[in-house]
Structures are given as structure tokens and as C-alpha cells.
Amino acid sequence: MTVLKMTDLDLAGKRVLIREDLNVPVKDGVVKSDARILASLPTIKLALEKGAAVLVCSHLGRPEEGVYSEEDSLAPVAAYLSKALGREVPLVKDYLGGVEVKAGELVLLENVRFNKGEKKNSDELAQQYAALCDVFVMDAFGTAHRAQGSTHGVAKFAKVACAGPLLAAELEALGKALDKPARPMLAIVAGSKVSTKLDVLNSLADICDSLIVGGGIANTFLAAAGLPVGKSLYEADLVDTAKAIAAKVSVPLPVDVVVAKAFAEDAEATVKSVKDVADDDMILDIGPQTAQQFAEMLKASQTILWNGPVGVFEFDQFGNGTKALALAIAESPAFSIAGGGDTLAAIDKYGVSEQISYISTGGGAFLEFVEGKVLPAVEVLEQRAK
């Protein structure tokens, strides 16, 4: 995968437009989770250090396209950036006709989704974005799977289009895990439905040595093995699909599980052998014996890809399985990559972020890359690098 990198370019005196993913939760005008903003800071600082005139753009929320709405304004993000960088970061509302920015200065452009044609990837809008800069930097991996004006279109028309450090690091880490993984490679794929992660499961079944499944997905695999799942969430129509995946790759199944009679924060948790699940039981986590077996496998792996918690970890009594696996990944010598919103929440909860080799910032983009799909925003950078 060959793309131009921002780190290799001379940016002195150049107008540099950086597409970041600053789509953060905001409540009452205050940023509630700053992870994405923090991830973008090194790129912004580097462009300023290189003497560029820097314009940063992003989307936020899902406003009606072409219509300004205060609740989806990037004003709280501009305020946060001003504080974090110790300098005023003006928010520019009307910028499609051009913006005055001097070398060493930084401005934040208002929500790109307020511009008509952003989602449809209109060439006219993309050309207006491109006219704002000498160099376009795509640094938002989380939106790389969307062909939109500020992620894909602008890269077609900008004088120079390159990958920012965040995007480049993401592509490198995913390439390391998927192209030539050190063996043995183990993947954890968990979620409520096989149907939503079918492409991921099939793709990883071709690459991995072992595939640990969790959540509702695991229940479908248990049913495929003829084991009782009680009233747990599972997909009866995908039992044959689960059998086909298990025929391609080793899918170790739980030997014990944690069950409850109801899905509730105060539900009583009971550990049972997987064979003893009753008709009115719901499986909400893997049991301690299973957690130990899976943990040993993780510690013996050389590459680990983790997507999804293996239990309902939001309720502490059903979080022990996910906690045990998180700690095992942290202890493992493997190159480990983790992605997906719930996975990141589990990593935070169990305090293992420092011990995981790479944490992906992109939810949908992460999954599409793992599925082997082409990410439009990356593809256009590759074409421009030729």
C-alpha cells in the first residue's frame, strides 16, 4: 500500500487542509469524550511546526445536510482545541469562498456536513475544498470507508493529497496484523449477531489460526455444536453458516458460561457447565474455566486482533470473562490490535490501553478493512501517489 505521507513533505508556507475525525460527544456545549481530539493533536502540531498555514475540518453528528444547527456546531471543539494548544483556534463558518490563514496559524472549519453535497461526494464541493489548500491531508481513519466530499472528493482535486500520521499508523498496524501476521494468530470477534459480522468472521477464518467468538455470536456457534442456549440471543438461521466457519478454522467453544434469568443490572449470575444451560437461562458471559483456557491461548499467540467484549461487561457480574481476556492480551508478547466502540470501552474499564500494541480509532472503517474491503479515502490516496 503506497500513499504519500505528510511526514515526508515540505509544508513551509503551504496552506494545509487536514481532515480529522473530531466527531466527539458534546453535551450542553461541552466535549464529553476527548479521545478523538487528543489523537489528532500530534498531526496538527506537526503541521504547525513545519511552518504551514493550517486549516482543520471534520464532521460532527448527523445534521440535515446544508442546514446549520447549533447542536452540531464544532464550536465546543474549537474551544477545546484552543485550551489544549494554548492558542486561540478560530472557528470559520463561511469558508468555501476562501480563508485567510498565514503560516503558523490554525483555524477550524465549521462542520463539513453543513455543506450541501458533502455526503453525495459532489465534485463541485470537493473542488471548493481543494481550492482552500496546497496540500490535503487525510488523517481520519474513522471516516475512510465513506466516499464523501471532505474524505474522498477533495483528494481527487487537491494539488497534493497525502495520509496524515494517524491514518498512516492505522494502515501500518492493520497491515502488520493482516498481511503477514506473526504466528500463531488469534482473533476475538464478539457481538450480538453473526449476520452483522459475517464478512469479518469469514475473512478472519482464512487468516487466523484460532478464532474466539463471544456474545450472541458465540451462542449461534454453541447451537451449531448441538449445545443448549436456553433463551439466549442467537440466530437459528445461521447455524449452518457457523458450522461452515468452524470447518475452516479452529473455533474453541466455552466449556462453562455465566447465566442469568433476566438481562438486568441486578440479575443474579450463575456459573454453569455449557451442557447444563436451562431453557429459561440467558448466557451473558464466558465462565472462569473458559476464560482461563482462552487467556492461555492469548498468552501463547504472536498476533492478536480483538473486536468485541465476550460478555455483558457493562454489568460487573458479567464482565469477568472480558476482564480476563483484556488482562491476558495485555500480558501477551503478541502484536495486538483492538478496535470497535465496545472494545475501546472495555479497554478503558480494565485499564489496559498502554499494553495493547495498537488501538484502532475507526469503528466501521476498522471492520471494513478487516473484511478486506477497499476504503475509498485510502484508495484515492494510493491513486494520487502514482
Swiss-Prot record:
GO cellular component: cytosol
Binding site for ATP: 197, 314, 340-343
UniProt binding sites for substrate: 21-23, 36, 59-62, 113, 146
GO biological process: gluconeogenesis; glycolytic process
Gene3D superfamilies membership: Phosphoglycerate kinase, N-terminal domain
Cell compartments where the protein resides: Cytoplasm
Keyword Methyltransferase on entry: no
GO function term, MF aspect, one: ADP binding
Major localization class: cytoplasm
Enzyme Commission code: 2.7.2.3
Pathway(s) this gene product operates in, as recorded in its UniProt entry: Carbohydrate degradation; glycolysis; pyruvate from D-glyceraldehyde 3-phosphate: step 2/5
Annotated SUPFAM superfamilies: Phosphoglycerate kinase (SSF53748)
InterPro entries: Phosphoglycerate_kinase (IPR001576), Phosphoglycerate_kinase_CS (IPR015911), Phosphoglycerate_kinase_N (IPR015824), Phosphoglycerate_kinase_sf (IPR036043)
HAMAP family: Phosphoglyc_kinase
Family from the record: Belongs to the phosphoglycerate kinase family.
Protein name per Swiss-Prot or TrEMBL: Phosphoglycerate kinase
Organism (species): Ectopseudomonas mendocina (strain ymp) (Pseudomonas mendocina)
Gene name of the record: pgk
